[in-house]
């Protein structure tokens, strides 16, 4: 143990699984501290009451189990969608976007219970340790963060199970062997990494995909879906108004049937290494395509292009755990301002893994049929294009003449 001020009470991000159950007991022993557990329902699809029973069995008296699905989608996913945020051109940031909310609630519960520390179960190799801790420190710079995987010597499955058995911690039969891969899930996505997925040359086995049906087995008939937006946020599906979490749940169900949202990606982690992940984001893939579709007819060209320039920076900040940073908030303010007229409906076609926008309509549309028609019109004089081209060509002509004068043929 370090010479730091002793910890009296710690709030643990607790799933009820083997790892965090061991961490709970380890915190009690190694720090001689009272442990408060916090379990979040972010739409991961797991029964959460077992976490309560396990925490009670471990002697925990303050147990927080919270349904955060609406807050998660409304306050974290939707702002990300307004930004069209995609990391390294492909990744829809499903794990990254869940961490700020968990960090926020850890801090809030610590304040409410008088805890002087929080703890998480992220390993010392991944991005999540960074995301959790940057979030905590941004909200309370004086709160201590404990990361057991960076402190203890329980560095194998065998040691974890032995520790659990020595301390009377329940170990499910299916947890005694080494899991073939690790899974993280929430309402936005499911990610699978490690073990059988570590060789990027090998195709992922069918058992990896838990959120989506195989595109090859999807219906032979396409399905059409209409999504309505107000100020950049999705508010209805097929004419039915619904809350953010309910809407995303509906899109997840549609995407699952049609095999939408699968991604096999090797990404650059913030901590320096490359990692291979299998991501399933069925509803998110549909929603992102729809949002792009409504922006196509409602955003001014300059605003649209500026957003596309800002998006990679926004996505990088989110991926690296800087959700609560001033620069992310500055970008968000600009992005949100751009969305005031992003209102209307988008019609999409789902078919065997693909999502295609096939229709868009809006009272705020900037699309003018009178101006773009190939037929004869009275609003646009094509002769005007000549002066426009000459002005834009001037610098290119001057460059070309200099090359000719100096004999530069390249």
Swiss-Prot record:
Localization per Swiss-Prot or TrEMBL: Cytoplasm
Family annotation (InterPro entries): Arginosuc_syn_C (IPR048268), Arginosuc_syn_N (IPR048267), Arginosuc_synth (IPR001518), Arginosuc_synth_CS (IPR018223), Arginosuc_synth_type_1_subfam (IPR023434), AS_cat/multimer_dom_body (IPR024074), Rossmann-like_a/b/a_fold (IPR014729)
Predominant cellular place of this UniProt entry's protein: cytoplasm
GO biological process: argininosuccinate metabolic process; L-arginine biosynthetic process; urea cycle
Residues bound to L-citrulline: 91, 96, 127, 131, 182, 191, 267, 279
Domain of life: Bacteria
One Pfam family of this chain: Arginosuc_syn_C
Pathway noted in the entry: Amino-acid biosynthesis; L-arginine biosynthesis; L-arginine from L-ornithine and carbamoyl phosphate: step 2/3
PROSITE patterns in alphabetical order: ARGININOSUCCIN_SYN_1, ARGININOSUCCIN_SYN_2
GO molecular function: argininosuccinate synthase activity; ATP binding
EC number: 6.3.4.5
Enzyme class: ligase
Residues engaged in binding ATP: 13-21, 40, 121
Residues in coiled coil: none
Gene3D superfamilies: Argininosuccinate synthetase, chain A, domain 2, HUPs, Single helix bin
Assembly information from the UniProt record: Homotetramer.
Name of the protein: Argininosuccinate synthase
Organism: Maricaulis maris (strain MCS10) (Caulobacter maris)
Gene: argG
């Amino acid at each position: 143990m370090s010479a730091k001020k002793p910890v009296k009470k710690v709030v643990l991000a607790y799933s009820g699984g083997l790892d965090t159950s061991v961490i709970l007991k380890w915190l009690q022993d190694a720090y001689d501290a009272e442990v408060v557990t916090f379990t979040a329902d972010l739409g991961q699809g797991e029964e959460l009451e077992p976490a309560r029973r396990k925490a009670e069995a471990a002697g925990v008296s303050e147990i927080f189990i919270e349904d955060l699905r609406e807050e998660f989608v409304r306050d974290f996913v939707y702002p990300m969608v307004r930004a069209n945020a995609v990391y390294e051109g492909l990744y829809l940031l499903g794990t990254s976007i869940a961490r700020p909310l968990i960090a926020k609630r850890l801090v809030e519960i610590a304040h409410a219970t008088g805890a002087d520390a929080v703890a998480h179960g992220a390993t010392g190799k991944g991005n999540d340790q960074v995301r959790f801790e940057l979030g905590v420190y941004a909200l309370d710079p004086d709160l201590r963060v404990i990361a057991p995987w960076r402190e203890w010597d329980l560095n194998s499955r065998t040691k974890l199970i032995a520790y659990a058995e020595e301390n009377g911690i329940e170990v499910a039969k299916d947890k005694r062997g080494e899991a073939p891969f690790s899974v993280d899930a929430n309402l936005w996505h499911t990610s699978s990494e490690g073990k059988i997925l570590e060789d990027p040359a090998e195709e992922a086995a069918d058992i990896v995909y838990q959120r989506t049906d195989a595109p090859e087995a999807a219906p032979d008939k396409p399905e059409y879906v209409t999504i309505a937006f107000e100020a950049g946020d999705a508010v209805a599906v097929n004419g039915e108004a619904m809350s953010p979490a309910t809407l995303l749940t509906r899109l997840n169900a549609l995407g699952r049937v049609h095999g939408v949202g699968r991604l096999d990606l090797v990404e650059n982690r913030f901590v320096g290494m490359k990692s291979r992940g299998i991501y399933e984001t069925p509803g998110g893939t549909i929603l992102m395509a729809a949002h792009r579709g409504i922006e196509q007819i409602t955003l001014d060209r300059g605003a649209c292009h500026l957003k596309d320039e800002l998006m990679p920076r926004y996505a990088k900040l989110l991926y690296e755990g800087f959700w609560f940073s001033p620069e992310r908030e500055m970008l968000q303010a600009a992005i949100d301002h751009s969305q005031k007229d992003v209102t209307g409906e988008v019609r999409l076609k789902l078919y065997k893994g693909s999502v295609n926008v096939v229709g868009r309509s809006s009272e705020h549309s900037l699309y003018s049929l009178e101006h773009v028609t190939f037929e004869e019109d009275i609003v646009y004089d094509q002769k005007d294009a000549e002066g426009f081209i000459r002005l834009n060509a001037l610098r290119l002509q001057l460059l070309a003449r200099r090359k000719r004068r100096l004999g530069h043929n390249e």
